Amino acid sequence: MKIPSIIVAVALCAFALLPTAVAQQKPVIHLGTPGARLVQYHATIHDVKYVYGVAAPVAHLRSGDMLETNTLDAFGNVLQGPSDTLDMVKGDNPLTGPFYIEGAEPGDTLAITFLDLQVDGKQGVGAFAPGFGALNSSTYTPMLGPPLPERIWYYPVDHARNVATFQAHDSSFKVEIPLHPFFGCIGVAPTGGEARSSIVPAENGGNMDAPEASVGNTLYLPVNVPGALLYMGDGHAAMGDGEVDGTAIEVPLRARLQVRLVKGRKIEWPRFENQNSIMAVGITRPLDDALRVAFTQLIAWIHADYGLSELDAYELVSKAATIHLDEMVDPNYVIVASIDKKYLPPRKK
C-alpha cells in the first residue's frame, strides 16, 4: 500500500493549492518562521475511510493550523467514461482523514474555515441507481412503478469559465451550470465509540450535502472524542436543493482549510457562519423535526451570543429567518435555518 505524504511547515498565510499528486516524503517541520503552520496531506484510494469513527490519524493539527489536502469523488474516482458502471464503485463516500486536533476534548467546538476549494479534474459525474433517490421506488418508500434504471451523466468542467455542462441523454439539449465547489461530507467522530457510515448525516456532521460548506464560510462541529478526528470528502461542483436524485456534480476537490479550537464551548449540532449570517443545522427524520432542530438551535445561538431572550429570539426568527433544504435523500434530512446579522444586536464579548 502506498504511504500518503504529509508535509508540515511553518509558513505565511498565502499558500498555493496542492498539485494533483504530491511526492512521497516524511513529515518535515520548519521552525522559527513567523506565521501560521501549514500541513499538507495527499490522499489516495488506498488510504481513504468509509466511516466516521475512531481511527489512527493521518496527521495532527494544532488550533490555527492551515491544512491543504485533496478528496476523491463519491465514486472513488473510478467512473471515467461511458463503459463504466456503478458496480465498479467500492463503497460509500470515501473520506480523507481523520485529522487529530491537538488539545480537542469532548465539550469543545471545532471551527473549520474554508479558504479555497478547487475542482480537481476535467469532469464531474452525476448518477442514479435503482432504489436510491427521493423520487425512486425502494423497499422502504415504495411507489407505483418499478425502480428507475441506472444512469450516469458526465459533466465537462471548464475551469477558465467556472462552469460545468449538463448534456441530456435523450436529446441534444445541453446547458452550463455555474461551479460552486463544496464538501458534501465533512464531520468528526461521533460519541461512544460509534462508527457511522460516511453516507449518514447526523449531529457529528457527516454527509450533510451542505452548499454552506464552501469558501467564505466557517463550519462549527461539536467535539465528541479526544482529538475530534476530522474527516472530509464527497466533493461537489454544484448541486440543486435537496440533492433530489441522490447525487450532485460529484468531483474530486483540492482544499485549503484553517482549523481553530474553541475550548469549553459546547454545541449540540453543526453550525455555519460567514460575514453576513449565522446558520444552524437540523439533521433528522421526519422533515418537520429537522426543521425544529434547526430553528431551536438558531434561537439558542441568538440567545447565547447576542443577548436576546429566548422568546424575543423566537419572535425575531419567525419574522426574519430563512431555511434551506440541503438534503432529502440520505438516512436523515438536512435543514439549515439562517438569519442575517443585520437583524441582530451586537455580539456579546
Question: What does each model-identified segment do?
Answer:
Residues V8-L17:
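Bacterial N-terminal signal peptides
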Residues A21-Q25:
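Boundary at the C-terminal end of the N-terminal hydrophobic targeting segment
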Residues P27-D87:
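N-terminal, Lys/Arg-enriched amphipathic/low-complexity engagement segments
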Residues Y41-Y52, M88-L95, R196-N204, L298:
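Short, structured beta-strand/loop micro-motifs enriched in basic residues and often containing a Trp
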Residues A74-L86, L117-F128, G227-A237, D326-V329:
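Short, Lys/Arg- and Gly-enriched loop/turn segments at beta-strand edges
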Residues D116-P211:
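Intrinsically disordered, low-complexity linker/loop segments enriched in Gly/Pro
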Residues L179-D288, I299:
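Conserved mixed alpha/beta catalytic, RNA-binding, or beta-rich assembly cores of soluble enzyme
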